[in-house]
Amino acid sequence: GRLSGTQFTPEKGWDENKLEFFRRHIVQLGRSGLFVVYDELAGKEPVEWNYLLHTVELPMEVGKEEGGLRILGKNKADGISIAHLYSSQEMTYAQTDTFFVAALDWKKRLGKALANHYHFTATTTPCNKVFFLNIIDVHGNNRADAVINHQGNRITVEGWVIECNLDSEGKAFLHIENTQNGASLDFNYNSNKGATTIVDQVGGKRIEKRLVDSLPKPEI
């Protein structure tokens, strides 16, 4: 930093890493336009956890629903994205139409000012550990919004049953099943040692695979 003039301070983004664990599970539910994002987060001390979502053209419409938040995003081409956000901790939320740091075309390549985007932030109460579940419904103007039914750790939507830990205690788990087409996903530390088992029907055949984390090889 001496030659470049970089200041290694918390205000400049340099500080002790207080994140102890992070794992994200992303699942596409067939071709339904539904996606499941399940996050496990743990810190070395109680902190407020933030969950961010963004839109480019139009502001989001945010409201509370059973056990969580409903965040509706649209664009000017009739694209719709609805995030159904749940957490193991209570959440407050806010939305702004300005960047945390102003976007500058410092190379002068665009020839125009950069428009502000819209930024949603959900914030939890201070805690060491948190689970987030986000069920995202993406579609155009060709169908109605998917209907979400939420009861505790169980959610049903369009023939899919989603179960996960949304309590403040216990280990993370994620189980997704569609009884109509036989597809399923199971992630569980206790019964599956942290591996993920997926079952699907491909070309009329039942396919089962076991997925585990694969760490990248170091470059040096």
Positions of PLM-derived features:
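CBM-like, beta-strand-rich accessory domains located in the C-terminal region of large
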Residues: G1-I220
